[in-house]
Amino acid sequence: MNRHISLRALAVIVLLLAGRAAAETPNRVTILYDSFGKSPSLTMDWGFAALVEYGGKRILFDTGNNARIFEHNVKALRVDLRNLDFAVISHRHADHTSGITYLLTLNPKVQIYVPDEPWGLFARGVKNDFYRKDPSLPADMRYYGGHPPEILEGGTPWPGGNFIPVSQRTEVAPGIFILPGVSTSPGTLELRELSLAIKSPQGVILIVGCSHPGVEHIVQEATAIDPHINILLGGLHQIHKPDAEVERIAAVLHDQYKLERVAPGHCTGEPEFAALKRAFGDHYVYAGVGSVVDLPGATVARTAGRGQ
């Protein structure tokens, strides 16, 4: 009897301590990889990676363009990648995937959510009906001699990766959603991309990689979770856009969607940085490599590193 009471009491204490630890964990995003920043101890390079911490969850979003640089920045920022709830790879481009090699040396079993691509980096096979067949050809001119396997297996540079393909909006943890999209732009036509949306009491926290499906489309998808967007953080892919489009996007995000804050990075583009700064003023959050963006609440970011 006393033993059972003691076990129940111990279980209650463990739950209380776990809840307290989660409550004390800061809600924040640490920028691990980008091509602009303030810290001399970090290496700038084209690409994107961020550690998202919210509600006790630790989520790696993208892994940068160079595994060695990713490793350097992670170590300089004293970030522990062995203790992750999961990782998200926004899309297949190398400036978001190259650090997977380093991640898997530290955390080989980590779940990695990826776009549901029919072929390519994440070893997804494709049925043999994707190509037309011509039985009139001799066998030596036909693929697989005219007898292809039912599934053509894709290759991957990370054969041990625990990749989980996502093809529809998925709630991967309470209040944490992965939003898939598809690019319709000529240069990246049909490219699949994932964004991360977290429902907070102050609105949606929206993390994006490159916004190839279009930042307006991604924001619109996020408003299905909550019409109020607390913050939009990441690459908005305006680097090649003319001034009129740059200004239009800034106005749409501020006036139409009424985002509370923006923290642009990566492929957003310098002219778009300037346009968003003009539109959002004090609600523009600097998010260069090494920055720590508080979630949700504070509209300022600090630079992480030794002594911080």
Please identify what each model-predicted range represents.
Residues 52, 62, 74, 91, ...:
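Divalent metal-coordination and catalytic microenvironments
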